[in-house]
From Swiss-Prot:
It catalyses: Exonucleolytic cleavage in either 5'- to 3'- or 3'- to 5'-direction to yield nucleoside 5'-phosphates. Its EC number is 3.1.11.6. It comes from the Bacteria. SUPFAM superfamilies: XseB-like. Coiled coil: none annotated. Heterooligomer composed of large and small subunits. It is an enzyme of class 3 (hydrolase). Its main location: cytoplasm. InterPro entries: Exonuc_VII_S, Exonuc_VII_ssu_sf. It comes from Citrifermentans bemidjiense (strain ATCC BAA-1014 / DSM 16622 / JCM 12645 / Bem). Bidirectionally degrades single-stranded DNA into large acid-insoluble oligonucleotides, which are then degraded further into small acid-soluble oligonucleotides. This is Exodeoxyribonuclease 7 small subunit.
Length: 75
């Protein structure tokens, strides 16, 4: 799979889902589409995880200055 951009992979994943939901594919075509969809889903998940690690939170200090801190997901 030579997809480089998240948006491209997401669009292709959406297209695969539409094909599968359409119900007009043969069993073999459905399996192939499903396998493609799993690959696109894994790629998108990986890209989202990479982006999450890069996100930083801007925090205002008492003196009015700002610093960045790593993003921490609230539980």
């Amino acid at each position: 799979m030579a997809v480089e951009k998240f948006e491209t992979a997401l669009k292709k994943l959406e297209d695969v889902v539409k094909k599968l939901e359409g119900g007009e594919l043969s069993l073999e075509e459905s399996l192939k589409a499903f396998e493609e969809g799993v690959k696109f889903s894994a790629f998108c998940s990986k890209k989202l995880n990479e982006a999450e690690r890069r996100v930083e939170t801007l925090v205002k200090q008492r003196d009015g200055s700002f610093v960045t801190k790593p993003f921490e997901e609230e539980e």
